[in-house]
Amino acid sequence: MPTIKQLIRNTRQKIRNVTKSPALRGCPQRRGTCTRVYTITPKKPNSALRKVARVRLTSGFEITAYIPGIGHNLQEHSVVLVRGGRVKDLPGVRYHIVRGTLDAVGVKDRQQGRSKYGVKKPK
């Protein structure tokens, strides 16, 4: 417990909260351009080829973003919308691409959980 004299000399430090998605600069989403679209393997014990894209954001950051859902149409120079949210088994992937906006089309033949994959209600 500090004395009054010690508290006068140097005040208590405020606890700084560190953001988990710094590239978004406090915005809910950011627009960006794909510079590379590729697959990476998850860490143990999982095994797959996860689809990711390297994206240059309007905030100037170059990030790795996960492409959710089955199948996609993204390639180099595709304009995408990026939101926060990490992928637990992919180290360094802290962002998701929003499906159904800009150049990223929604998932084909999706029936359930459609809003998360940019799919309109089927007729």
UniProtKB/Swiss-Prot annotation:
Cite a single Pfam family from the UniProt record: Ribosom_S12_S23
Family recorded in the similarity comment: Belongs to the universal ribosomal protein uS12 family.
The listed locations are: Plastid, Chloroplast
What CDD domains has UniProt attached to this entry? Ribosomal_S12
Q: How does it assemble?
A: Part of the 30S ribosomal subunit.
Q: Is this entry keyworded Nucleotide-binding?
A: no
- This chain belongs to the protein called Small ribosomal subunit protein uS12cz/uS12cy
